[in-house]
Amino acid sequence: MLTLAFDTATGAATIALVQDGNVLGERVGRASAILADGDELVRAAGAVPGDLDLIAVGVGPGSFTGVRIGLAAARGLALALDVPVAGISTLDALAAAARGAVPVVDARRGEIFTLVSGHARCLAPEGLEVEQDRTYVGDGALRYRGTIEERGGVIPSDGSELHIPHARFHARLAGEGGPAELVEPVYLRAPDAERATA
């Protein structure tokens, strides 16, 4: 199965082309270039977009705009190519990169997105239950390094690849997918613009 996977929910937009579990190519770039990057990866692998069997997309939580960009791109590709889409949690993809690690995404406004008992939650960094010697990954772990480390958590170095939700893990978690219109974003809170007008 030839899968194009991408995630634009965080500051590091990632994309990967995966054939039956083998990574044919991947990039970290900008959300605005995700379709162009995908086309280049497909062509560099000697394929054409019509060869794709599945689109795997990060559904958040993360940046409201980033999640929308990713979902719009996935839905557009699915419609044009008549392929299924699999929505993958950005947190699950981060956790898949480092077995046993706790994913922590910066939610801005002094909050984080993380998994609590397997469920995505938005909370203050101080509300994160930190376990002694457990690894914490993601841009939120980096931003709140002091809070996490002073309570016994372990955070890989700033440049570690573990802090990026690499799309190869979205492909690994994807399964068969389904109709694009059934893939829903995971926001966990209202967008900033909506909150400002409320």
Language-model segments: residues:
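Phosphate/pyrophosphate-binding loops at sites that engage ATP/ADP/AMP, CoA/4′-phosphopantetheine
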Residues: G38-L54, E129-R134
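DPxDG-like acidic metal-binding loop motif
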Residues: L54-P84
